[in-house]
Structure formats: C-alpha cells, structure tokens
Design a protein with these regions (language model features):
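Beta-rich, blade/repeat-based domains predominating
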Residues: 97-108, 141-152, 182-194, 227-240, ...
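A short beta-strand motif characteristic of beta-propeller blades
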Residues: 88-94, 132-139, 174-180, 217-227, ...
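Blade-loop segments of beta-propeller domains
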Residues: 131-168, 173-184
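Conserved beta-strand positions in repeat-built beta-propeller and related beta-rich domains
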Residues: 113-117, 157-163, 199-203, 244-249, ...
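A short helix->beta-strand "capping" segment at the edge of beta-propeller domains
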Residues: 77-98, 128-134
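Loop/turn-rich, solvent-exposed surfaces of beta-rich toroidal or solenoidal domains
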Residues: 227-263
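Short loop/turn segments that connect beta-strands within beta-propeller blades
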Residues: 126-131, 169-173, 210-214, 258-262, ...
C-alpha cells in the first residue's frame, strides 16, 4: 500500500485528498489517515494555524482485524513570499578578529559572546564599544562552542557535535552544570522568549525546550513559500519573532521566522558588511545577531570579523 495525495505541496486553506494506491487490489475493510499522528477525515482542509514543513503522513489499512501501516510525507509551504529587508549602518565597533563567533546576546550594556573551534572555544563578556573582553571562560579543547542565551540569571551555551550544553551563573560566569541534548543531534543556535528556549541544530528544525530542564518539547521547520530552509544557525528573539542567521545561496542573510508555525516572514540581506572587515585568512560567514532593546538596534558580526556593526532594518 502507498499513500497518494492530490498535490505534491500544499498551503493552509487547501483541500487535501488522500487515497491508497493498492497495486495488488488487496481487499481491505477500512482505512484511517493520520497527519503528525492525529487522525483526520478526508477530504481535509488544511487549517490556517498548521505547522509548516514536511508533515509525517500515515495510513492505517485494516484487513480482517489486522492493521497495515503506510507512511509518507506531505509538504506544507508558506502562503506568502517573505518581505525583503535591507539595513542602515549606524555604528562600527572593534571586534576580536580571533573570535569565531557562534552566539551573541545583550544583558543591559554587557554583550555576551560564545566562540567556536576546538581549542579556541570560549564564553565571553565583552565591552561592545571598545571590543575589550571583560571576562573569558575557555572551554575544554574537546568542545566546539556554539550558540548561547541568557535567562533567569543563567547563561546557557551549546556545543556543536558533543551532545552537551553548559549552564553558567550570569554574574560570576562560573559553570554550574552540563546537560545533554534530547532528539536534536547537534547544537547550533540558541535564544529564549523569557519562558522557553529555542534551539537550532543545523537542519530545518528549531526546537522548543523547557528552560529549567532543557527538555525538547516540540519543533517548527523553517519554511518559505517555495522550500524548507536548512543550516539555521545563530538565533535571536525580538518582540515575539525569531531572527536566524543562515548562509543561503552564497549570501549572508538573516531570516525572520514566525515561532508558531515556522513561516519565513522576512529575509534581511546583509550584503556588503563582510567587505568592511579586515580580510584575514580564516574570515568566515556572518554569524552573530544581538538586539539592543534600549537602542532599538541590531548588532551584527561574523566568524573572525574585526568589526561589530550596529544597524537598523528597513523593508525594501
């Protein structure tokens, strides 16, 4: 048995017709269809609040009391194209060009930064105006540092492929404990909305985690009107919306994501910024976005960038 749908891709509001391809013409008693594990009646109108992305689809075929399962995926895309944004440069500040930036977040006037590469990974508190490192905690050389976020007086820092995150006291930066990942296999970006954590793992998924236990509870898939985006990296939460660094099509871009369903509502093209930094060996992509609530500006840097840029955003 094989699941057949009336279209390859759908958007919310579409009517979904599911049938079973039964090549052997096997007699069966009944069929039940499921999307994301929940039984549906067909035809099925895709609700407006549906999660976007690749939807696990199942059919349960009943034959004389026995159940046979067929599995597939349906792709649910965003209804509208993302808005395009550009930036205005407000300020340039010095940034450590040896910092392979993986995470960036403000606490008042203090900028916290996580850096990567084995043997060079660290957690830092930085004076963003001077670039001076006020305090630095180096990770053991077995770890490759990734994203970070600040919540409830703690710093939470990810590592890449070591299946481990670290929790520090915000003020002293003393490490308190570690935790292991759940279903996500890697650590990339991290942010929070004041209640829960959001974690990217290099795929199309952004996971929601309980802040206290770091347990993964659900995920969204980052989806445009045409495709599903992967390599979602450093994250920032701003006024109910997720901002994510991602390197797409040879461009340094940040995507603006609806945290409820994964829809890409905007794309910010940061073309030109990388040309303004010292062109050293090892210079890498834009990765690092931090919002300053008082200044209402974004701070942008990259891996081994010699500058930290303060910008405002405008729709094109």
């Amino acid at each position: 048995f094989k699941i057949k749908a009336n279209q390859k891709t759908f958007v919310t509001g579409d009517t979904l017709h599911l049938t079973i391809q039964n090549r052997k013409n096997t007699a069966y008693d009944s069929i039940q269809f499921f999307l994301r594990g929940e039984r549906i009646a067909v035809p099925y109108i895709v609700p407006e609040d549906a999660l976007l992305g690749d939807i696990p689809t199942e059919a349960a075929v009943f034959i004389e009391g026995k159940e046979i399962r067929a599995t597939s995926h349906l792709r649910l895309l965003n209804k509208t194209a993302p808005s395009l944004y550009t930036y205005t440069l407000v300020n340039e500040f010095p940034h450590d060009k040896q910092a392979y930036t993986q995470g960036l977040e403000f606490d008042g006037e203090h900028l916290y930064e996580s850096t990567g590469l084995k043997g060079k990974s660290s957690l830092r508190r930085v004076n963003y105006k001077t670039g001076a490192i006020e305090k630095q905690i180096d990770l053991d050389a077995t770890y490759f540092g990734e994203g970070l976020t600040l919540i409830n007086g703690k710093i939470i820092q990810l590592t890449w492929q070591e299946n481990t995150g670290f929790i520090y006291d915000l003020e002293s930066m003393a490490m308190e404990r570690s935790f292991t990942y759940d279903q996500s296999k890697e650590g990339w970006g991290l942010c929070n909305d004041g209640t829960v954590l959001y974690k990217s793992d290099g795929t199309s998924k952004i996971w929601t985690l309980e802040a206290a236990t770091q347990k993964e509870t659900s995920y969204i898939e980052v989806t445009t009107h045409k495709t599903i985006l992967t390599k979602i990296n450093e994250l920032e939460w701003v006024k109910g919306t997720l901002y994510a660094n991602t390197y797409q099509g040879q461009k340094d871009v940040v995507v603006i994501i609806n945290p409820k369903n994964g829809a890409v509502d905007g794309i910010i093209d940061f073309a030109g910024l990388r040309n303004k930094v010292e062109q050293i060996q090892g210079l890498d992509v834009l990765n690092g976005i931090a919002y300053h609530p008082e200044r209402k500006t974004f701070f942008i840097t990259g891996k081994n960038w010699s500058k930290l840029f303060e910008v405002t955003l405008q729709k094109k």
